[in-house]
Structure formats: structure tokens, C-alpha cells
Amino acid sequence: MEACCKKSRKANSDPTRKNWLNLPLLALIKVYRYAISPLLGPRCRFEPTCSSYAEQALIEHGPFKGTMLALSRLSKCHPWHAGGYDPVPKK
């Protein structure tokens, strides 16, 4: 198979399918977004929001490091932290 075909297949593959442990974690984020977050209202002090950050961290870094990054971010999301722009670190 040519190199160009392999590259295009890699680019189009869904990153969550590569690691099945991400699926239940991403499902929990969706439950939070659609069931809990609307009841609480907009409270996140960060950009991207904590749920978006957690989703991106899981996809980019996998379930273990992604969870640690998400928990670290959630520990900063309180009234005594300034918040601001805090993107997911690159691999």
C-alpha cells in the first residue's frame, strides 16, 4: 500500500476508537453536558470549558494521562482562581 493511502486513513480514523477505555469516560462527559450542566448554568472560569478540556485531553493523551489532566484542571475551577485561557498541552 502506498504511503499516501496510509496517511489518509490515519488522518480520517476516529481517535476514540483507538482506545476503548476513552468511550465510557467520554460518555460521562456527555452526560454531564446534557443533564447536569444545564441545571448549574455557565460557571466555568476557563476557555475552553472544563468539559471541553477533559474531552480534548482524553482524545489527545489517552485515558490515564487525560484523566489526570482533567482532574488537575477541575481542581482549579473554583471562585478563588482567576481562570482564563488554558489549552490542553501538546503531546
Curated annotation (Swiss-Prot):
UniProt cross-references to SMART domains, sorted A to Z = Haemolytic
Q: Which UniProt keywords apply?
A: Cell inner membrane, Cell membrane, Membrane
Bilayer disposition of the protein: Peripheral membrane protein
Role, per record: Could be involved in insertion of integral membrane proteins into the membrane.
Q: Which HAMAP family match?
A: UPF0161_YidD (MF_00386)
* Keyword Repeat carried by entry: no
Superkingdom of origin: Bacteria
Q: Which species does this protein come from?
A: Saccharophagus degradans (strain 2-40 / ATCC 43961 / DSM 17024)
Q: What is this protein called?
A: Putative membrane protein insertion efficiency factor
Q: What is the similarity comment for this entry?
A: Belongs to the UPF0161 family.
Q: What is the lineage of its organism?
A: Bacteria, Pseudomonadati, Pseudomonadota, Gammaproteobacteria, Cellvibrionales
Which GO cellular component does the record give, naming just one? plasma membrane
Tell me the compartments it is located in.
Cell inner membrane
Q: What is its main location?
A: membrane
